Regions:
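Active-site loop of short-chain dehydrogenase/reductase
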Residues: 16, 88-90, 134-147, 182-186
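Conserved glycine-rich cofactor-binding loop
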Residues: 17, 24-25
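Substrate-binding pocket helix/loop in short-chain dehydrogenase/reductase
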Residues: 103-104, 108-114
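The beta1-alpha1 cofactor-binding region of Rossmann-like NAD(H)/NADP(H)-dependent oxidoreductases
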Residues: 49-50, 68-78, 109
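A short, exposed helix-loop element centered on a Lys and neighboring polar residues
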Residues: 127-128, 174
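SDR active-site lid
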Residues: 178-248
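Catalytic loop of short-chain dehydrogenase/reductase
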Residues: 144-168, 173-174, 178-181, 194
Length: 275
């Protein structure tokens, strides 16, 4: 693995176990492969078993695939029972997320429920199910959350439902980070910018209860196909884990994210009044 993936430190995590959700491609695949390259054994989760198996096979003996739906609390709990049989866990990365282009005012109920189910409730159910597996772990413990740079901006533009759900992802992760700290567990809130992932076609694996699979027009993929690789985030993620976590925004837009965040904060601050 050291020949395939970027070498890194994370020495205190070598020989420990990790779980990465949404690891069948994109950011999750990058995380799973690099964690394995750092000497961890990795449980590769995806809602699509074949995707999880592909990534696990490419990693080798250090990886185990598993498939379940993070928006289904019972499925998360059952999966946790299975994974617990192999021992405690030191690192959890709550990465699974879906991209939804619908508006809020006119969005279909199933699209809204799906976005909230994965990007919001999925964060809660995943942490409720798997953080208990960290209780008996020795050595450092860390939970990562993948939010989005969209969580730092006003929730508008071409993907308002997605942006809104990621604001909620960020808020839940922020609250959970305090609860985790009380348990002696560090955490990182990762906010990536636009990257070369398949998030534009997330509905290809949408469960039936949310309307079933839907395949996006490949023409929509252009801006993602031309975007930077998720791999570029890895050195920053390593630094965050080693430093004990915190906020980590990996912007890809030449300063626009910072400007949008600062403008939003200034607009809010300008209208804080004492009564």
């Amino acid at each position: 693995l050291e020949n395939l993936f970027v070498s890194n430190k994370l020495n205190d995590f070598q020989g420990k176990r990790a779980l990465v959700t949404g690891a069948g491609d994109g950011i999750g695949e990058m995380l799973a492969k690099n964690l394995a390259g750092a000497g961890l054994s990795v449980v590769v989760q995806d809602i699509r078993l074949e995707a999880a198996e592909r990534v696990a096979q490419e990693i080798g003996d250090a990886a185990t695939p598993i498939a379940f739906d993070v928006s289904d609390r019972e499925a998360c709990m059952i999966a946790a029972e299975t994974i617990a049989n192999d021992g405690p866990m030191n690192l959890l990365w709550v990465n699974a997320g879906v991209g939804v282009g619908a508006s809020i005012l006119k969005g279909r109920p199933n699209a809204i429920e799906w976005a909230v189910g994965v990007n919001v409730l999925g964060v809660v159910w995943t942490t409720q199910a798997f953080v208990p597996l960290m209780a008996s772990a020795t050595g450092p413990r860390h939970v990562g959350f993948t939010a989005s740079s969209a969580a730092l901006r006003k929730a508008e533009g071409s993907h308002p439902l997605y942006a809104t759900s990621k604001h909620a992802t960020f808020a839940f992760a922020e609250s959970l980070s305090t609860e985790l700290a009380n348990e002696g567990i560090n955490s990182t809130i990762l906010c990536p910018g636009l990257l070369n992932t398949k998030i534009w076609d997330g509905a290809r694996a949408r469960p039936d209860r949310f309307g079933g699979p839907r395949f996006a027009d490949p023409a929509l993929s252009k801006q993602w196909d031309e975007a930077k690789s998720p791999q570029l985030m890895w050195p920053e993620i390593v630094r965050s884990i080693e430093a004990g976590g915190g906020y980590l925004t990996c912007a890809t837009d030449n300063g626009e994210t910072r400007q949008a965040f600062e403008s939003r904060a200034e607009a809010i601050a300008a209208h804080i009044v004492q009564i």
